[in-house]
Design a protein with these regions (language model features):
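Catalytic Walker B motif of ABC-type/P-loop ATPase nucleotide-binding domains
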Residues: 162-165
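A short, surface-exposed alpha-helical micro-motif characterized by mixed small hydrophobic
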Residues: 203-205
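Helix N-cap at the start of a conserved alpha-helix in ABC-type nucleotide-binding domains
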Residues: 173-175
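Conserved ABC ATPase signature
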Residues: 137-141, 145
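A short, proline-enriched helix->beta-strand linker immediately N-terminal to the Walker B motif
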Residues: 156-160
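H-loop/switch region of ABC-family ATPase nucleotide-binding domains
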Residues: 197-198
């Protein structure tokens, strides 16, 4: 077992968004969350690495366990190192090249040397098919390329789990395939992932387990 999420709850102004969710995720498993808009899918993802503050519950990743009701600053940092997130909007540094965007976390968070960080960043950009775009700034990249840089940046951190929140929803239809291929390749390489997507054919292609969320509860789970 890789991750155990227990009793995860969250409400906004009295409205329950996550209702005592429990979930076990195995190492190397790709779990997809589906459900209508407002079902709590993005809040669930963002709560896992404390971008949203859960009201209660805990998460255990291997032997690292955090109780959300009494989490410390140090635990938040550790949690974010273990869980890397890719958002709908690419969140790249506009004034840095693709390569520097991928390197940033390796140097700042992981304290790697510039040389080591560059090597890893180049490897990850190659995996998403962007070796020829290393020196390009985001403004010179298509939406699909930007999202692939964001995926490379997340994977460069060697997270225990990759969290993907609607990674293709901001893209033009013709760019979706290239991003989905990058995610599918990461899944094949054994990367554990939790993914929110509206694209059911993509979910069927990459997910090992699909959870249907409604009103903050998992009401159904199965294989695609």
């Amino acid at each position: 077992l890789m991750i155990k999420i227990s009793n995860l709850s969250k409400s906004f102004s009295g409205q329950t968004v996550l209702d005592h969710l429990n979930l076990d995720i195995q190492k190397g498993e790709v779990v997809a969350l589906i459900g209508s808009s407002g079902a709590g899918k993005s809040t669930f993802l963002r709560s896992l690495n404390y971008l949203e503050t859960p009201d209660s519950g805990s998460i255990q990743i291997d032997d690292f366990k955090v109780d959300f009701s009494q989490i410390t600053q140090e635990e938040i940092l550790t949690l974010r190192r273990k869980l890397s997130m890719v958002f709908q909007q690419f969140n790249l540094f506009e004034r840095r090249t693709a390569l520097d965007n991928v390197k940033e976390g390796l140097v700042v968070v992981k304290k790697l040397s510039d040389e080591e960080a560059t090597e890893i960043a180049k490897e990850e950009l190659a995996k998403v098919g962007l070796s020829d775009r290393e020196q390009h700034y985001p403004r010179h990249l298509s939406g699909g390329q930007k999202q692939r840089v964001a995926i490379a940046r997340a994977l460069a951190m060697k997270p225990d789990v990759l969290l993907l929140d609607e990674p293709t929803s901001a893209l033009d239809p013709e760019l979706v395939g290239e991003v989905e291929r990058s995610i599918a390749n990461a899944a094949k390489s054994g990367q554990t992932m939790v993914l929110v997507s509206h694209d059911m054919s993509f979910v069927a292609q990459v997910a090992d387990k699909v959870l249907f969320l409604d009103k903050g509860k998992i009401i159904e789970s199965g294989t695609p």
